[in-house]
Amino acid sequence: MNIGIYIYDDAEVLDFSGPFEVFSTAKRLANNDWQVSLIAQTNGPVNARGGFSVNPHYSFADCPELDVFIVVGGDHTHELEKSAVIEWLIHTASTTKRVASVCTGAFLLAKTGLLCKKNVTTHWQDQSDLAAMFKDLTVIANKRWVTDGKFTTSGGISAGIDMSLALVAELINKEHALLTAKQMEYAWL
């Protein structure tokens, strides 16, 4: 199973490192064939928030077909304006079995039109902006994550860990998600 996490300049570090750790730990504990990777528009380093530099495993050009696709948040405003990014998000999210966003990554997924008429969430501070920009969404407050069909969106930053554990529960089982959380010494549920 290929799990891909989309990153970009000024992405929130915990938005991608938290889910990466959850899926990597779940893989190790299950001894399964999951491949967890970071994907960026190009193969060059990505400068996340706080100057954190990270090298993606893949670019848009060489990214394998994904089974689970996660779009992270951060300062997403420039990404919303990039037609190549939005087109790639549309293609990738349309061909992936499970699609998720962390924090303001919901804005990027909403821009694709694929969240139309869906229940979603995002960081508490951005919920009113998401609802104002994308009037065809139902923005749910006070939830760590919301699932509607194949789409799961999470609240801000650390909520991506909770959402990722929920996806592990769905993909393997709840016991394995609880074991993953315990291994990470993370209080979940």
Language model: regions and residue ranges:
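Short, glycine-/small-residue-rich phosphate/pyrophosphate-handling segment
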Residues: 114-132
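Divalent-metal (often Zn2+) His-rich catalytic cores of metallo-beta-lactamase-fold enzymes
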Residues: 159
